[in-house]
C-alpha cells in the first residue's frame, strides 16, 4: 500500500515537472515564474473541480464525517496534489520567490496530506481544506498575469481583486471556521489532525490580514481618484469649459 502511494506521488511529481518543462519550452520569451504560475493555475482549476466533486457528490460530507476512512478517489486526488506541492515548494526554495508565510503554507499542506495518506483517514476534511485553499488560486494567478501584461489597472483587474477578496473571506475564513469547529468537536479525528487544522487556519488568517490591508489601501486609492476626478469636473464647469445643455 505504501509503495503504491509513493509511486502515485512520484508519478504526480513527474507529471507536474513535465508540464512545467513544456510551458518553459512554449514560452521561451517569458520568465520561469510565468511557466510556474501556469502550472499553479492548472493545478488550481483541476484541484477545485476534483475536490468539489468529492465533497459535494462522491462524499462523505466533511462537516458531518470528519476523520472518516479515505476513499479511493480521495487518495488519488491527495497524491496528485502532494506531487504538485512538492514541486512548487522546491521551485519556491530554489528561486527564492516566496516569503516564510507561503513556505509555511506549502509545508503544512504537504505534512497534512502525508498524514492523511499514512493514517488512511481524515482525507475527507483534508480534501475540503484543499478546496477552500485552492478556490482563490486561479484568481491570484490571473491577477499576476494581468499585472505582467499591463492589464491589471482596468475593470477586469478590479473584478478579479474583488472576487479574490470576497471568496477568500467567505470560503477560506468563513466556511473554514465552521469546518474547523466541526473537526474540533468531533471525537473521530486524531488530536494531531486537529492541531494541523488549527495551524492551517492560523496561516489563512495571516494571509487574510495582508489581503484586507491591500483591499483597504486599494479602496482608499480608488476613492481619492474618484474624488479628484469629480473636483476637476466641477472646476471645469465653474470655469465655463464644459457646456451644459
From Swiss-Prot:
Chief localization: membrane
GO cellular component, one term: membrane
Annotated TM spans: 1-21, 38-58, 75-95, 99-119, 162-182, 191-211
Pfam family, one: TRAM_LAG1_CLN8
InterPro entries per UniProt: TLC-dom, TLCD5
TLC domain span: 29-204
Membrane-topology annotation of the record: Multi-pass membrane protein
Keywords for the protein's UniProt record, in alphabetical order: Membrane, Transmembrane, Transmembrane helix
Compartment annotation: Membrane
Family: Belongs to the TLCD5 family.
Name of protein: TLC domain-containing protein 5
Organism in which the protein naturally occurs: Mus musculus (Mouse)
Gene: Tlcd5
Amino acid at each position: 500500500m505504501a509503495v503504491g502511494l509513493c509511486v502515485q506521488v512520484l508519478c504526480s511529481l513527474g507529471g507536474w515537472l513535465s508540464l512545467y518543462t513544456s510551458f518553459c519550452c512554449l514560452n521561451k520569451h517569458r520568465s520561469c515564474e510565468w511557466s510556474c504560475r501556469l502550472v499553479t493555475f492548472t493545478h488550481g482549476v483541476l484541484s477545485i473541480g476534483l475536490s468539489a466533486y468529492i465533497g459535494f457528490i462522491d462524499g462523505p460530507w466533511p462537516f458531518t464525517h470528519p476523520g472518516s476512512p479515505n476513499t479511493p478517489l480521495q487518495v488519488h486526488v491527495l497524491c496528485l496534489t502532494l506531487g504538485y506541492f512538492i514541486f512548487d515548494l522546491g521551485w519556491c526554495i530554489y528561486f527564492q520567490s516566496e516569503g516564510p508565510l507561503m513556505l509555511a503554507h506549502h509545508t503544512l499542506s504537504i505534512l497534512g496530506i502525508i498524514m492523511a495518506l499514512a493514517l488512511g483517514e481524515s482525507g475527507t476534511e483534508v480534501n475540503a481544506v484543499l478546496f477552500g485553499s485552492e478556490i482563490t488560486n486561479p484568481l491570484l494567478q490571473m491577477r499576476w498575469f494581468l499585472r505582467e501584461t499591463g492589464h491589471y489597472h482596468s475593470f477586469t483587474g478590479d473584478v478579479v481583486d474583488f472576487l479574490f477578496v470576497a471568496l477568500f473571506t467567505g470560503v477560506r475564513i468563513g466556511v473554514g471556521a465552521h469546518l474547523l469547529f466541526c473537526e474540533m468537536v468531533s471525537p473521530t479525528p486524531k488530536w494531531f489532525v486537529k492541531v494541523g487544522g488549527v495551524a492551517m487556519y492560523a496561516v489563512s488568517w495571516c494571509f487574510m490580514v495582508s489581503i484586507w490591508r491591500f483591499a483597504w489601501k486599494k479602496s482608499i486609492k480608488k476613492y481619492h481618484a474618484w474624488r479628484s476626478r469629480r473636483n476637476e469636473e466641477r472646476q471645469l464647469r465653474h470655469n465655463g469649459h464644459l457646456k451644459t445643455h
